[in-house]
Amino acid sequence: MYRTVLSVFYPMFFILVIPSLILLIFIILRYSPDCFQTFKYILLVTCISQIVAVTTNCLIQIRQVSNLTPMEIWCYGPLRHFTALIAYSTYFLTQTAVVISNVLIFLTIYLKYLATKINTRKTCNYGVTFFILSPIFIALGAQTSLILTEGIPSENQDHLEKINFDISDHAVIGYIRLKTLPSIIITFVITGTILILPAVGLLLRKKTLRNINSNKFSITKKALIKGFINGVTLQVFLPLICYIPVFGSFLVLAETKTEVPFEQYFFSVLVMLPMLFDPYIILYSVAPYRKQIEKWIKTKRRQSILIVDPAARIGF
């Protein structure tokens, strides 16, 4: 039953998310104001990382079989027809893209907070920015280590090739050993970004709103900043809501070696779920983008009226 549901879900999820991200990229490139250059590039990279995450997730469609020892990674997607190394590397690419997206969304909050401060020290800001980005490089290093030690060795590839003599349903692409150092690092990075960033983001939101109320910002400017910071804060909290329940279940089930098919099949689905809403949150919370959408809608309505009106007169 789970496989039947997911065989429909993954294509539908791809069709729903990717066009909205492409539309957002177009609007960012075409309609971002000059004062929005830094945020423009951050939003672009965030969108690209989400496209990569969604695409690779749909290609691998993994199931982490936590009741087996060692824990096996099963691939149900099209990449099961390729070598296990390609699918295993894609599995980590998906993780990296998710971490990049989460970290850059938080970085957007931090930079917006800095933009509302009167006095800022550039050297300190650069250091904090690098610290915020550091989880990306740490996770990438740990994932590269696992690919080099677990994926590339010929004996491991030969072993997986023997196991995967029949890939009509799925392929085993690798193993998860939670007690190895790289796996521990990856687990801490992912859970850290999910747990810590929302709390700090909420604090920065509070400070940003306090800054715009105390500093000499116009009413319009205050409304724009408030709408933007509220939207980005919501983005930071979405992974916490979607990810923590299933990840907590994963850790418990991995330790107890209990099989719960729902958790195994839908783990990667729930991790990606925030990306369904992210483009619409940005399009609504960033005033120039929202106004452009409203302009298109009004233009479309006028065109519809102009097309219908002559026919109505002819009928009269």
UniProtKB/Swiss-Prot annotation:
A matching Pfam family: 7TM_GPCR_Srd
Keywords attached to this entry: Membrane, Transmembrane, Transmembrane helix
InterPro entries hit by this protein: 7TM_GPCR_serpentine_rcpt_Srd (IPR019421), Nematode_rcpt-like_delta (IPR050920)
UniProt-annotated location(s): Membrane
Keyword Ribosomal protein: no
Bilayer topology term: Multi-pass membrane protein
Coiled coil regions, renumbered to chain: none
Membrane-spanning segments: 8-28, 42-62, 91-111, 128-148, 184-204, 234-254, 266-286
Keyword Transmembrane helix among UniProt keywords: yes
GO cellular component, one term: membrane
Family per record: Belongs to the nematode receptor-like protein srd family.
Protein name (Swiss-Prot/TrEMBL): Serpentine receptor class delta-45
Annotated source species: Caenorhabditis elegans
